[in-house]
UniProtKB/Swiss-Prot annotation:
Gene3D superfamilies: HUPs, Valyl/Leucyl/Isoleucyl-tRNA synthetase, editing domain. PANTHER family: LEUCINE--TRNA LIGASE, MITOCHONDRIAL, LEUCYL-TRNA SYNTHETASE. GO terms for molecular function: aminoacyl-tRNA deacylase activity; ATP binding; leucine-tRNA ligase activity. InterPro entries: aa-tRNA-synth_I_CS, aa-tRNA-synth_Ia, Leu-tRNA-ligase, Leu_tRNA-synth_edit, Methionyl/Leucyl_tRNA_Synth, Rossmann-like_a/b/a_fold, Val/Leu/Ile-tRNA-synth_edit. Its main location: cytoplasm. GO terms for biological process: leucyl-tRNA aminoacylation. This is Leucine--tRNA ligase subunit alpha. It catalyses: tRNA(Leu) + L-leucine + ATP = L-leucyl-tRNA(Leu) + AMP + diphosphate. The gene is leuS. It comes from Aquifex aeolicus (strain VF5). One of its GO terms (cellular component) is cytosol. Keywords: Aminoacyl-tRNA synthetase, ATP-binding, Cytoplasm, Ligase, Nucleotide-binding, Protein biosynthesis. Seems to consist of an alpha chain and a beta chain. Belongs to the class-I aminoacyl-tRNA synthetase family.
Length: 634
């Protein structure tokens, strides 16, 4: 008989017995399957209490349902690519792979000590070539179907380090490492056409109602941001257009000479207010800004260098900084556009509050009925024209009226209610070739290019003769090279001549590999499917096994992933269904967002003290206390 209870000895004994007996090993094909999954961790080096709380919830569900006769799949793996490993390589001179795998080993030991009921036979790490081979395979399928494509995109660029920075590496407009002011630079990048799935992603949120937190569904709906409205064509009339040809790019010259116009397309959800548009604003990045500023200067109405300085200032600000900026700032471009509704000439500006990523990157400004436009108009003394009369009294000197009402000052549309006017004005503009009904989305295609080493290589090469050529499937995986230099400057993959210089799979001539790697969200967008069949070396996963285990019955993770990981995973599921590889429309049946552990409690020791426990106490007691704490706060 045991003289003294020693939780560590007892835990080790039973954990060993569980492992030897394969107690938590999932059984293929048995009835009553149940798939429990917590979002897998980045191997940062240490398990913290955020992990423990998350995994305790999953463990409790898995154990309970196992005792109720369910055939449980409860796997664990590692979201192992990422920037911290590369930073460690630069700072400490340790290779990202060595740093990552050492962290995985340590964290796996910690998880085993905690006694979670994982089927470790299904363990995956996204940095293993056996895993990222299938990232590359999926990418090639997307390329075949036109879902993956390449175009130039603006990125955060550090001129000193000659490298691209993630948003989190930009601190107050400067490089986090060297302090150099960042600039927005256009670089060729790979995109995934998630917008092609926008309507399905939006529509299928209805299937998740009552199963996912309402807050997550609302965030995804807002992120997709479907807006019904109209595309309206304002235009700048140019007399003697031949005098301005050197201001204009080639693609606009024919229209300019033929029609003596430069068109500015704007998207609006309020076509009923078009008669109240008193100015037009273009995003600083809009390609027409330098064109119109050049023309404006020639006309003597604007100073091109002032416009250029404003645009450069905006380039040094992130989208987030511009969105949060309360002060409206802009510059007149020196030209006037014709409002197609009433023929009025209205000034064209560029301003900080208009983003090129949304709509067309240009807006018609109706300061009487849009608060941002009202603030801008007040600052720059621009006219405010009321065209929607509210039911009650409204002081337009104090702010814009953004609601619906009855149209006034709108020519033949006076007296119509806003909703009727939206439809009739859109039809009227369409008949005149100056507008059309349009659906716009806030959602933008996903830029997956990262100018970094520790990620999945993008499987294409560039040949002088053949152009861009996909790497054949039988040559996958394209592996990361080991002979790279980590200096913090430039793209590390470009330092490996062995990697960069290759032969064209099509003609056998000289070629250069793509040196961008994939966004790590690509890795986590389908890992839940790989857990169903993690050892498969012939395909990403067996359709039969995925049909048995999927969808994930309970998925557990933080709400901070609501509009990135969770949206991307849904997108991948739908794309893979289009390929005939999966059956289900949605990957996760029920979602639990467990809430964030406050930073001061992330330390294991601090939380143990708070719970009245020590490192010598039972692991099961810790789990019990965490569950009780969660129940009290639910």
């Amino acid at each position: 008989m045991m003289k003294e209870f020693n939780p560590r000895e007892i835990e080790k004994k039973w954990q060993k017995r569980w492992e030897e007996a394969g107690v938590f090993k999932a059984q293929e094909g048995k009835p009553n399957k149940f798939y429990v999954l917590e979002m897998f961790p980045y191997p940062s080096g240490r398990i913290h209490m955020g992990h423990v709380r998350n995994y305790t919830i999953g463990d409790a569900i898995a154990r309970y349902l196992k005792m109720r006769g369910k055939n449980i799949l409860h796997p664990m793996g590692w979201d192992a690519f990422g920037l911290p490993a590369e930073n460690a390589a630069i700072k400490h001179g340790i290779h990202p792979a060595k740093w990552t795998y050492e962290n995985i080993d340590y964290m796996k030991k910690q998880l085993k000590i905690l006694g979670f009921s994982y089927d470790w036979d299904r363990e995956i790490a996204t940095c293993d070539p056996e895993y990222y081979k299938w990232n590359q395979w999926i990418f090639l399928k997307m390329l075949e179907r036109g879902i993956a494509y390449r175009k130039t995109a603006k990125v955060n660029w550090c001129p000193h380090d000659q490298t691209v920075l993630a948003n989190e590496q930009v601190i107050e407009g400067k490089c986090w490492r060297c302090g150099t002011p960042i600039v927005q630079k256009e670089v060729p990048s790979w995109f995934l056409r998630i917008t092609a799935y926008a309507d399905r992603l939006l529509e299928d949120l209805k299937k998740l109602e009552g199963k996912w937190p309402e807050r997550v569904i609302a965030q995804q709906r807002n992120w997709i941001g479907r807006s019904e409205g109209a595309l309206i064509r304002f235009y700048v009339e140019i007399e003697e257009p031949e005098k301005f040809l050197n201001c204009v790019p080639e693609e606009l010259k024919e229209t300019l000479l033929k029609e003596k116009r430069i068109y500015i397309d704007v998207f609006t959800t309020r076509p009923d207010t078009v008669f109240g548009a008193t100015f037009v604003v273009l995003a600083p990045e809009h390609p027409l800004v330098p064109v119109l500023a050049c023309i404006g200067e020639r006309l003597g109405n604007a100073c091109y260098s002032d416009v250029e300085n404003f645009v450069e200032k905006m380039k040094k600000m992130s989208t987030r900084e511009r969105t949060m900026e309360e002060d409206k700032e802009g510059v007149f471009l020196g030209v006037y556009a014709t409002n197609p509704a009433n023929g009025e000439k209205i000034p064209v500006w560029s301003a900080n509050y208009v983003l090129y990523e949304y709509g067309t990157g240009a807006i018609m400004c109706v300061p009487a009925h849009d608060q941002r436009d009202w603030e801008f108009a007040k600052k720059y003394d621009l006219p405010i024209k009321v065209v929607v009369k509210p039911e009650g009294a409204w002081d337009f000197e104090k702010g814009a009226y953004e609601g619906k009402g009855t149209l006034v000052n709108s020519d033949g549309f006076d007296g119509l209610d806003s909703e009727t006017a939206k439809r009739k004005i859109t039809e009227w503009l369409q008949d005149r070739g100056l507008g059309e009904k349009k659906v716009s989305y806030r959602l933008r295609d996903w830029n997956i290019s990262r100018q970094r080493y520790w990620g999945t290589p993008i499987p294409v090469v560039y040949c002088e003769k053949c152009g861009m050529v996909p790497v054949p499937e039988d040559q996958l995986p394209v592996k990361l090279p080991l002979d790279v230099k980590f200096t913090g400057q430039g793209n590390p993959l470009e330092t490996s001549e062995e990697f960069v210089n290759t032969t064209c799979p099509k003609c056998g001539g000289k070629a250069r590999r793509e040196t961008d790697t994939m966004d790590t969200f690509f890795d986590s967008s389908w890992y839940f499917l790989r857990f169903c069949d993690p050892k498969n070396d012939r395909e990403p996963f067996s359709r039969e096994k995925v049909d048995y285990w999927m969808p994930v019955d309970v998925y557990i993770g933080g709400i901070e992933h609501a509009v990135l990981h969770l949206l991307y995973a849904r997108f991948f599921q739908k794309f893979l269904k289009d390929l005939g590889l999966v059956r289900d429309d949605e990957p996760f049946e029920k979602l639990i967002t467990q809430g964030m552990v406050l930073k001061k409690w992330v330390s294991v020791k601090k939380l143990l003290d708070y719970l009245g426990l020590s490192e010598e106490d039972e692991v099961e007691e810790l789990k019990k206390r965490l569950e009780e704490l969660g129940a009290r706060r639910a």
